A protein has these predicted regions:
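Propeptides and adjacent flexible N-terminal/non-core segments of secreted
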Residues: 209-212
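A solvent-exposed, charged loop/short amphipathic helix patch at secondary-structure junctions
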Residues: 204-206
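Catalytic alpha-helical scaffold of carbohydrate-active enzymes acting on polysaccharides/glycoconjugates
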Residues: 1-201, 214-238, 244-310
């Protein structure tokens, strides 16, 4: 059994959210984050830096929208974290990625501490079949019908999509595996971790599955909240706040109810990188070994069979 973490300020557990910006719009975002702020949750909101020139099904508002950008800066001033979700909602070449990262630094006065790959983008780093190794890669390719075997090239130095050195320079934490369990730390007790087989990423972290409002509310059920508290664990929920949390200008009542209940517990509610910075010192962040990597990959593949895309 993993020993309990002595959380800051005598808190009993930790909880945060990484909000994937796919399909986001300002009006719905404002409703969600007003609720989170009122309940004293400080979480991570990812962004795209520029409007793309090829609209996709995932297209959403970007930092090119001045009203949205001003709202992001207000959000940051309230204690929320701004994370990175690639340059835009479609593939970008190296120079475009470089310019996107420089724009992030210029706007927010620091590099993005935390990021998640956007599934449609070829510049994703160590993504698709490259997330796993050995026999797990073969199984992954069968599950995905080999569609993502050689699609992602962000770590490939010979590719025009290569930006591995820029990732290592700018970004501290990159999200990889997602699990159905609310206690992310229980699933990945050594996060954040280094992986010597993936040298362009400084540290990896895992998360818990809350892809849309239904899955989010299921993961933060009363029973799961209580268990997270009892286990003294840490949850990094991965979600898309654009997916069902707001309908006709109204925020999900179930979401509000669950988050209000959670807010009354003695939890540490900080942004993703704040939580990972603490864990890095507390756990003395390490290089993952082959045995740990195998176990993590098998667990993720098992969850993937149940959850689908993670």
């Amino acid at each position: 059994m993993q020993p309990k973490i002595p959380w800051p300020n005598n808190k009993q557990f930790a909880f945060t959210i990484f909000d994937d910006t796919d399909r986001a719009n300002l009006k719905d975002n404002q409703l969600v984050y007003q609720c989170l702020n009122e309940l004293n949750f400080k979480t991570t909101k990812s962004v795209w830096m520029t409007d793309g020139n090829k609209p996709t099904k995932d297209s959403g508002v970007t930092c090119d929208d001045k009203i949205y950008l001003n709202w992001l800066l207000e959000l940051k001033n309230k204690g929320f974290e701004i994370g990175y979700h690639n340059t835009t909602y479609h593939s970008s070449y190296r120079q475009e990625i470089k310019e996107g990262l420089e724009k992030f630094v210029k706007i927010f006065n620091h590099s993005p501490a935390v990021m998640a790959n956007h599934s449609a983008n070829q510049e994703n780093i160590y993504w698709g079949s490259h997330r796993v190794s050995g026999s797990r890669r073969a199984i992954y390719n069968i599950l995905t019908r080999f569609k993502k075997n050689k699609f992602y090239k962000g770590h490939n130095e010979s590719s025009p999509y290569f930006w591995g050195d820029l990732c290592r320079k700018h970004i501290t934490y990159v999200r990889n595996f997602v699990f159905s369990d609310i206690n992310t730390l229980k699933c990945c007790p050594f996060m954040p971790y280094r992986d010597l087989t993936k040298p362009y990423v400084n540290y990896w972290f895992a998360s818990s599955e809350g892809n849309n409002v239904k899955m989010f509310n299921k993961c933060v059920s009363d029973k799961n909240q209580d268990r997270l508290e009892e286990e003294g664990g840490a949850c990094i929920m991965y979600t898309h706040f654009a997916d069902g949390f707001c309908q006709n200008g109204e925020l999900s009542e179930k979401f509000k109810k669950q988050m209000k209940r959670l807010s009354k517990k003695n939890g540490w509610f900080v942004p993703v990188s704040t939580l990972l910075d603490f864990l890095k010192k507390e756990i003395k962040a390490q290089e993952i070994n082959p045995k740990q990597r195998r176990a993590l990959e098998w667990k993720w593949l098992f969850d993937k069979l149940i959850l689908g895309s993670t």
